[in-house]
């Protein structure tokens, strides 16, 4: 993984350590190195940086320390499973420093929960054995800054719950605001007959999600639903306001696939956005069809529907960027993105090329997960070209 961006301080080349353990090096003044990654949740402990000395690691992390670049960003993804005790935090900071890293991307919102104090979101079960005063993010900030490391808060934007293990806390957003959840086309008609307040709604969505493990990681909130976007923005604003973070790292700022979001609120929002721009006769026809077909408007206007969903995701990213800069102007705002810009746009409705072009993000981190060095180099080169670096 690497930071790739148009901002001079965020530009990157290919001094990279990716989660699966491939190490490459280069001489860019702003290269970056990453290890451990949330997309591998099923084996999170394997990738968590909580046990590690350099000899335990998948790669010889000490090699990173020898890269000669004064202004380099050598960043490490730190899973939330590494933040559960003060000892784990002390060990990860020490290991990161000793192995040449200078930046930690610390996962503080993994599944609509809070690995920090004072949030409206619930404290995760993994922290229940710790004192109520234990604040993982503040602990990393104190130890990391003392060790000369930069610390970014890593936030999962839309992914807010596992479908396999639904949240135990009843105040979780999944239960309080089920209407905010993204819905796949496959079961949208059926879910439209169930009130979101009913346990059957989340139950049906979770069962479908569990049956699609290769397509979707869990339950997502929708960037189309205004209240959901407001909520996500409030989480990021609170983090940037109360904690001396050096950056906010956005993950899962995308749709699971282009088969989402066919929820009732999303389709209503689309209808409202396009009704005045279509002929009155077409409008009357679609209104009549919608009474029996939830997909009347999206199916009649497929290009507009795709563009609308992409635009709403972009609008949320833009909003989060503006919020962070308002609260903490010097903080970087970065995003983990699908490595192929065209695939991200077509299949994840994630326009990260547009984000960079418009200055809505300071840098991207391409999720170049492969054991093939040639493919890895190709993906990073394509991302650099798209970013103009």
What are these regions, as identified by a protein language model?
Residues 112-156, 310-327:
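Aromatic-lined substrate-binding rim segments of carbohydrate-active enzymes
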Residues 83-97, 228-238, 343-357, 376-380:
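Short, acidic/polar
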